[in-house]
A protein has these predicted regions:
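Acidic/His-rich, divalent-metal-binding segments that scaffold phosphate/diphosphate chemistry
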Residues: 1-79
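Divalent metal-dependent catalytic cores for phosphoryl transfer on phosphate-bearing substrates
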Residues: 46-157
Length: 160
């Protein structure tokens, strides 16, 4: 599935957020690909290869909150603290669109709200790690997180 085809049925608000993503910068340390829209297209492309509609929706929504939360930090780099919570609220707001396309809103919400937490596993205390690993969607969150990892960026993906 192509990104542009997938978002044809998206509510106008989501299309507006995606357009704002084009103008939302990211730290080149974590995102050598550039702006949030380019990143979203790469994550979507990786998710689409699985054929799992839930991953595709999570890819669309996971960083939309960066349009509202991105700021220069004290080190002069871009940070988007808490963007996953804004993004997760958008999933709930647009649950009718998500479910009308055959996706599981609860799973999409869990993938979106958890996509940053899984990256912090090593910093969690053991009991918190075990609690997170016990989540019913843990393996899916882990897989989705791999789509979001730009350390594995290919030249082909940069051209998306």
């Amino acid at each position: 599935m192509e990104f542009s085809k997938f978002i044809e049925t998206a509510p106008e608000e989501i299309k507006d957020y995606l357009e704002k993503c084009r103008k939302t910068p990211q730290s080149p340390t974590w995102h050598p690909e550039g702006d949030v829209l380019k990143h979203t297209k790469i994550v979507f492309s990786r998710a689409a290869k699985t054929g799992d509609i839930n991953y595709m929706f999570a890819a669309i929504f996971h960083d939309l909150g960066k349009t509202e939360s991105t700021k220069l930090n004290k080190r002069g780099s871009w940070s988007s603290y808490g963007h996953e919570f804004i993004s997760a609220r958008l999933v709930i707001k647009h649950k009718d669109w998500i479910s009308s396309q055959g996706a599981d809103v609860d799973l999409v919400h869990d993938l979106v709200i958890s996509h940053m937490k899984i990256k912090m596993m090593d910093e969690m205390r053991k009991p918190k790690q075990e609690e997170f690993k016990a989540k019913p969607n843990y393996e899916k969150i882990k897989e989705f997180s791999s789509f979001d990892n730009m350390k594995t960026l290919t030249p082909e993906e940069l051209s998306l």
